[in-house]
């Protein structure tokens, strides 16, 4: 029920690998923070928004919650019958507005007034996904892909992921004003479209991806003008590139992970890839840094196997989720890298919700990540960045 408050479940322990204090914020049910391209923290860094099935533990029907990090108290904010799927929540940087998908509805929640409004209802045979606010908080962009699933994507160990890539021939980038007006498609494509993200400093610019195993996708990242519909590739890929998990830096540049040939961008519960054997050339993976026009202006070798990376505000420190550990990667002025283990996460990697998706707090002092232990427990963890790395 909306407004229900849950007592603190948090407790702190010393990580067995790094010795760093780690605070486990939840210890019951399924819980996970927002997708790594969004930030779960409010501007004060005193509260986080997250999803949980604690109000419906017999199913994976999750709702939206807010937690005060000092007290650990949690409050339920939504109670939609269809629930909210993982990674289908986004919010404005100031934390005032939250948008999410439930079933075929796009809804808007105002954290100040607590008003919850229906903005859009899908009437066609499309699946809604990947929503994101423009930086001026006036529009919400999202993807709509034809519902052609023979095997539903999102199962264990990327079940249905490759099949969905081949099946979808109608993918769209759509937009709507936050008052519910002027819904329209900006782009219609012949590929599964995903990972839509507005630029953090230009409300007209966004990026999206052609989704699928990285070794099957010919061109992953695209930059689009949301006012004109013009789009262009970001970093023109060659046969030896396997690119993905792109995100915007706070300064408005695009950062992407190029693992080179032989990598599909997945990880399974066995700790290995799903769709590719590691038979590539042995070329060193790297981070690419690109401007909004898609041109790459910097590359930094990144010889570490992490599944997702994210950067702090000044790009001096990256966080990643390696097979077993949450790691920090510091970058010096010459592009040199140094890896520091922050915590052993022990996640199973079985489901998308098992992925750690680590991210920084807005002030860059804390790392938030999720990890599971079995099919019915998924928890959220908080760890401070060591002072010597700040």
Over which residues does each language-model region extend?
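Short, conserved, GDST-rich strand-edge loop motifs in beta-rich repeat architectures
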Residues: 2-4, 52-60, 143-168, 209-218, ...
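Blade-terminus and WD-like Trp-Asp/Gly-His loop motifs, strongest in beta-propeller folds
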Residues: 38-47, 87-97, 101, 130-140, ...
